[in-house]
Amino acid sequence: MTGAGPRPWRSWAVVGAFALIVGAPAGALGGAWTLPQGTGQLIETLYGWTGFGPPWGGNPPVNQSRVDAQTYVQYGLTDSLTVFGQTALEHYALGPPTPNTYNGLDYSDLGLRAKLWSTGEWVFSGEATVFVPGGHDSKAPAQEGNTGVAGEARLNIGRNFTLGSIPGFVDAELAYRLRTAGPPDEWHGDLTVGFKFTPRVMLMLQDFTTVSMKTTDPTFPAWRSSVAEASLVYALDDKWSVQVGVFTTVWTVKTNSERGVALALWRNF
């Protein structure tokens, strides 16, 4: 038992997937929304965090740090069907008592988002995603718990609104993720609220919560985590945007804490 445990992962492209481009309505792209046919979005993200793992097995908390360079792309196959995928290079380091470092590919994923129903303000969609691990040495402390294929089904609900004269959107997502190679399956609940203060400036407030299923495996016990993030997105023009965000865990049970920053560059095409 490493004292590190299966670390949570998620796509930081989700942070950038709500592209409020110049002249577009709030929440036009990503999240619960599908892309118009023949259009796409590319997001390059660099993020990093430091934190502590839980004190398992009588060991003290474990210092941890991680840096990822992530590429995410989504493309509208039809107005109601969007394909998306991502890959990332990862540096993940554990401190004593089991120091170990992993440098290589993080999880890569490929998925489809289908619009189920929409009105003028509301949109409902579903997603199916498969995750392929980059690490394959389950005995290495920095890879343990993150060497198995995973699959996920997700339901998304989005709504555009105005707060006074400020356009905004809210996106709520619920997912169930099947894990292999050790860790228990997981429920994911993500919430995003965005406000477009000017044609170029958007504020996003987000929460990413994961609650695993119960398990009797002492190596991979049940765990919970909730990460809050605030970020600003600035549209350079109708195709390019930049994003700066900060995030921190606000709740953890038998998994690591996180405190970090994220930088992203968006390109609509």
Place the predicted regions along the sequence by residue.
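Cleavable N-terminal export/targeting peptides
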Residues: 1-35
